[in-house]
UniProtKB/Swiss-Prot annotation:
Any one GO BP annotation for this protein: DNA replication
Residues forming coiled coils: none
Entry's Gene Ontology cellular component terms: cytoplasm
Organism encoding this protein: Natranaerobius thermophilus (strain ATCC BAA-1301 / DSM 18059 / JW/NM-WN-LF)
PROSITE patterns: RECF_1, RECF_2
Name of the protein described by the UniProt record: DNA replication and repair protein RecF
Sequence positions that bind ATP: 30-37
Length: 386
């Protein structure tokens, strides 16, 4: 799939911008805080309906305006699509999603149109960062291939907030026994779906990332990726054979068993919101024992595995967004990433300098280059790419 046109109005620091893309690699370069990442954010938002960095949608609206407009022209192997997002906060929140000029009442119909994989400097902390970062990574990946997963997440966390509110309000076990069951049922229903989907997708990524990691390290190192749910299972084989019904039964029983502990802690101690991913390199915990180079190779392998998995699920590669990460990769890792994408994956790259590409004239020849300066984009020809 290829994005051939991008329009922004009152989005971040852009008042009105229209860009056309004709080459497989699009480079946005310029000084910091000029709006390079905002362009990738706009593309990501068109694909997912959310920002990868803003907590509140209002943060995306240009100063002293009441809403923003995004449009993308998308070419896929079987069809062409016009995607539009119109927001207005003048009289409360108003958000309209359109595909080919038709408003979408079902958000999932919009989200299944375009797929993206984003790789940013924050991702380099995936291995040694917090479990929350790793959960967010896998949840974003799953939503790309199964938009209904986002529905499960929203309903799960809605039930979780209500359950935690009750745990903070009441300390009497008998009183809680009357109020908790409806929210326990919601947690179990949606939480079981989340756990099963995470296990399914992590299994696919595990196999792909292992092969890619071996290739990057010239067959000298092995990467293992394990799903670590907060629910305790007897062994891995038992977990893999779990049906939704058995999992739901175990989840509910564990919630009831942990009730006294949850009352004391005033929070829910088990569930998908406590899950984690474990990375091992040559059977050692990469978080504790992996070098910085090994950890970066792990993240690179994961991102490349994302591309391949979405290709397998959707039939074509997603769009790749590289947000100021090439300067963080050595020549070997950069080469593997660009070789994988070359000729197959439309790639948008941000950088503060064209020096990131000085060793690769071929990439420059295949690229469209835009200099970004204070919310303005100037297209450069080959002679101006300095």
């Amino acid at each position: 799939m290829k994005l051939t046109e991008l329009c922004l109005k009152n989005f971040r620091n852009y008042s009105n911008l229209k860009l056309n893309f004709k080459k497989p690699i699009i480079l946005f370069f310029g000084a910091n805080a000029q709006g390079k990442t905002n362009l990738l954010e706009a593309i990501y938002y068109l694909a997912t309906g959310k920002s990868h960095r803003a907590q509140k949608e209002k943060e995306l609206i240009r100063w002293e305006t009441s809403g923003f407009y995004l449009k993308g022209e998308l070419e896929k192997e079987q069809a062409q699509y016009t995607l539009e997002i119109i927001t207005n906060y003048q009289n409360g929140k108003n958000k309209n999603l359109k595909v080919n000029n038709l408003s979408q009442t079902n958000t999932r119909n919009f989200l299944k149109t375009m797929n993206v994989v984003i790789f940013s400097p924050e991702d380099l902390m995936l291995v040694k960062g917090t479990p929350d970062n790793r959960r967010r990574f896998i949840d974003q990946e799953i939503t790309q291939v199964d938009p209904s997963y986002d529905f499960y997440l929203k309903n799960y966390f809605k039930a979780l907030r209500q359950r935690n509110k009750l745990l903070k309000t009441y300390q009497d076990k008998n009183t809680l026994a009357q109020h908790l069951p409806p929210w326990n049922q919601q947690l179990v229903h949606y939480g079981s779906k989340i756990i099963l989907k995470r296990e399914e997708v992590i299994h696919k990524i595990r196999l792909l990332a292992r092969l890619i990691y071996r290739k990057i390290t010239n067959q000298t190192e092995n990467l293992e990726l394990d799903y670590s749910p907060s629910l305790e299972f007897e062994d891995c084989k038992f977990r893999e054979q779990l049906s939704g019904e058995k999992l739901a039964h175990k989840f509910l029983n564990t919630l009831n068993e942990n009730l006294q502990s949850d009352i004391e802690k005033r929070t829910t101690s088990i569930g998908p919101h406590r899950d984690d991913l474990i990375f091992k390199i040559n059977n050692k915990d990469a978080r504790q024992f992996g070098s910085q180079g090994q950890q970066r190779t792990t993240v690179l392998a994961l991102k490349m595995a994302e591309l391949e998995m979405i290709k397998g699920e959707k039939g074509e590669f997603p769009i790749l967004l590289l947000d100021d990460v090439l300067s963080e990769l050595d020549d070997n890792r950069k080469k593997h990433l660009l070789n994988l994408t070359e000729g197959r994956v439309q790639t948008f790259v941000t950088s503060t300098s064209m020096e990131d590409f000085n060793g690769d004239v071929d990439i420059k020849a295949k690229s469209q280059v835009f200099r970004i300066d204070n919310g303005e984009a100037v297209k450069l020809n080959a002679g101006n790419q300095e």
